[in-house]
Amino acid sequence: MKNNFFEAVKGKLIISCQALPNEPLHSSFIMARMARAAKMAGAAGIRANSVVDIQAIQDEAGLPMIGIAKTDYPDSDVFITPTLKEMRAVAATGVEVVACQVTGQRRPHDEKLAEIVQQFRTEFPNTLLMADTDTIENALEADRLGFDMIGTTMRGYTPATQGMNIADHDFEYLKELRSQVTRPIIAEGKIDTPEKLKCCLELGCHAVVVGGAITRPLEIATRFIEAIK
């Protein structure tokens, strides 16, 4: 399974099909159709949130998947597949990859990342792990813990990186990350043009995830409306 995923997405686009409960397109049926459209366009894989969406998309698209479960806990700011419970639930769907947040913040119930990674490996030895990171330091920690791939997903979305973008200063952050980690890099987060997608691949990223710029019409329409106000 591991080799198949990496081979399937190498040098290609993975499209994130997600809609949260407060968004107009929140529906497993709609996300599955969104994934079908992504497949028709030539996407190599899908990233999806929640067990029900993942299962609907598996039935509809049949592409390699990165699965997550966004879950809020009162005692932590970590929300992307934050505990072993969510990791297990996502892995049980049969997705090729489970992604979880690795941002150095306290996890719910004070779970320790090293311990839950070790336990997950025991229970799901054939499922790949992706680290959704925000800084070089946290990417290196994920690398050390044996995550199979390093994502830039959380860059710009944590207190330490607020307002930052992987495209800043001619992709300086991505170049630095590439020089320091040993695992394949999955570029993700604020990649909103085809040109940025190409740059990420040219800089050596294994694959690129694009979401909002393709699959969130409310955000896309808002950008256009704001331009003429």
From Swiss-Prot:
The keyword Isomerase applies. SUPFAM superfamilies: Ribulose-phoshate binding barrel (SSF51366). It is an enzyme of class 5 (isomerase). GO terms for cellular component: cytosol. Keywords: Carbohydrate metabolism, Isomerase. Pathway: Amino-sugar metabolism; N-acetylneuraminate degradation; D-fructose 6-phosphate from N-acetylneuraminate: step 3/5. Its EC number is 5.1.3.9. InterPro entries: Aldolase_TIM (IPR013785), NanE (IPR007260), RibuloseP-bd_barrel (IPR011060). The keyword Cell division does not apply. One of its GO terms (biological process) is N-acetylmannosamine catabolic process. GO terms for molecular function: N-acylglucosamine-6-phosphate 2-epimerase activity. It catalyses: an N-acyl-D-glucosamine 6-phosphate = an N-acyl-D-mannosamine 6-phosphate. Pfam families: NanE. Converts N-acetylmannosamine-6-phosphate (ManNAc-6-P) to N-acetylglucosamine-6-phosphate (GlcNAc-6-P). Belongs to the NanE family. This is Putative N-acetylmannosamine-6-phosphate 2-epimerase.
